Each structure stands twice: as structure tokens, then as C-alpha cells.
Amino acid sequence: LRDIAADLGLSEVTVRTRAARLIEDGVLDICGQVDVEKLPGHTLALVAIKLRSPDLVGEGEVFSHLRGVVSVAVLTGRHDLILTVLLNEEFGLLDFYTNEFSKCHDRVSSIETFIVYKGFSLKVPYIL
């Protein structure tokens, strides 16, 4: 925060106070993120889901609690949700579908899976 204060021409105390308020309000989260391409044996999958239910937000919340799910976004278009899923050698795509996604399969009308083979400015929190 010292560097941010210097760049903005503000005191460090001012920046810390503002950052603390943003964190408290849920606007700012300071966390480490990893570049999956630099982690051997890791990959990202994007899982696009068409739901049976019109409760997109409620269903998104359910999917967000599955192991490996980094984030869930509610979409417009032909899919309702897109999940970002972190995978590794011990928890691969088959494990995700067999052990996690299967818990919610009755909520889904169709899915489409995309494997990220190259990302740009793509970093995620390490959750595995």
C-alpha cells in the first residue's frame, strides 16, 4: 500500500483507511492468484451450462460450492452459467464430472466444456 500511496500522492494512512473500508464493504479483496500455465499438471476448464430452472442466480450459488470451481458467472445467450474450474493431476476433468458435477446433474439441460490451452492475463486463486 506504500507504493500505491506514493503513486497517488496520498499518505499511506489514507490509502490504508480507504482500502480497509473497501475490504469491509466487500468491494476489495486482496488475495494471491496463480498463473495456471506456470503450474505443472494444472489446467483450467470453462463449463458452460444451460439450466432447467429459471433461477439462474440461485443455481449459480449451488454450482459455486463444487470442488474445483473458482468462479461462476450468470450469462446472457444460449448458456445460463459459465464455471471456471481449476484441475490438476489428482483432480482432473473426469473427477470433476464424476464426483462434483454429478451432484447437480438434474439441474442441467445441457453443458459444453472448454479447456483453456493458452491464457492472457488469466490468473486465478489456488483452491485445490
Label for each model-derived stretch:
Residues L1-L128:
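A compositional/biophysical signature of low hydrophobicity enriched in polar/charged and small residues
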